[in-house]
Each structure stands twice: as structure tokens, then as C-alpha cells.
Amino acid sequence: IRLTTAPRTAVDIARFHGVRDAVAAMDSLYREQTPFGQETIQLELAATIDRLAGKKGVGLARWALELSSVKSESPYESLFRTILTELGIQPQEQMWVGRRFRVDLLWGTLIIEIDGYMKFENMPHDEVMKMTRRENWLKEQGYEVLHLFPVEIIFDEAGCIRRLYAAKARADMRGAVSVPATSYRP
């Protein structure tokens, strides 16, 4: 049986299936790794791409590596971040708003949360209340919040983009936020 390494598989995903799938695959390699492990994986991906120079789809693999991120926490965050990048939008990832709340993606004052259905399955009342308080607090600080589900991103990308731009327009009308987001926990 012939096998490939995980980095080679991620590169081949770019070559044969496109940048979006490859970014999700590459991002998944970084999860659960130490910073040293993440750097090692980036180097392995780059070396694999270099070895395949001149082969079909290597340019896509290079682009996917540029777009890959050690911060992504789910394949659907990776996918939507890549879609945003294709639209010319550079969202910030895993930003802290205040000391208690970290958000998936941030575009100006628009918070974009990618929520899996499992998060809500059989959710206890206390958890629902905690989530509601979190969202209310974020809005009270001047942020607009957009929730997207994986099934929406996959099957209604155009609808997600329409909702994104509508939410961004609302966010821009809110004005300045009272608690700026930071990349580190304050």
C-alpha cells in the first residue's frame, strides 16, 4: 500500500480539488500542535510544494499555503475565511473583545461566528443564557454579530454573502466600539 504524508495530502488536495478545500486541510494540520509543531508543518508544506514545482496545480497549493492559518478552529471557519479573502476581505481571526470573549472572525466591527449544529444540540438552559448574555454584551459594546452555520456556507454561499454585506452595513452604521478587539487576551 502506498501512502502519502499529511502535508503531501494537503498539497494534493489543493492541486486536485482547489484552494478552499486545501486551506481547510492545511489549517487542520496545525490544530492541536505546539507553535514549534505548527512551524514544522508549515515548513513541510512549503518543502512539499517546492518538490512538486512545475506540476499541475502547484500554484494553487502555494496560494493555499499563503492563506492557511494556525488560528482556525474549524474547517468551516477556514472555508469562510477563504471565501472572504476571495472577495477581497481580510478578516481578523480569533480576536478578543474584552477579557472574556473571543470571536471567530472580525471584519471591522462585524463579528462573524461559524456555529456548528452540535453546539446547540441538547444545550442546557444555562448555556443558552450564557450565549445570549455574551451576544448582548458584544452588541452593547458596538459590534454587529452574524452567525453562520456550515450547511448555509456549503449550500447557500450567495445567501451568506448577502447576509454578510447587510450585517457589515449595519455594523458600519453603529459607529465606534467601546471595547476594541485585540489579538491577545487583555
Set out the residue ranges of the language-model regions:
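Phosphate-handling catalytic interfaces
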Residues: 1-90
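Basic, glycine-rich
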Residues: 96-101, 107, 111-186
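Glutamine-centric residue-chemistry signal
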Residues: 92-94
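Short, composition-biased local secondary-structure segments
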Residues: 43-56, 97-111
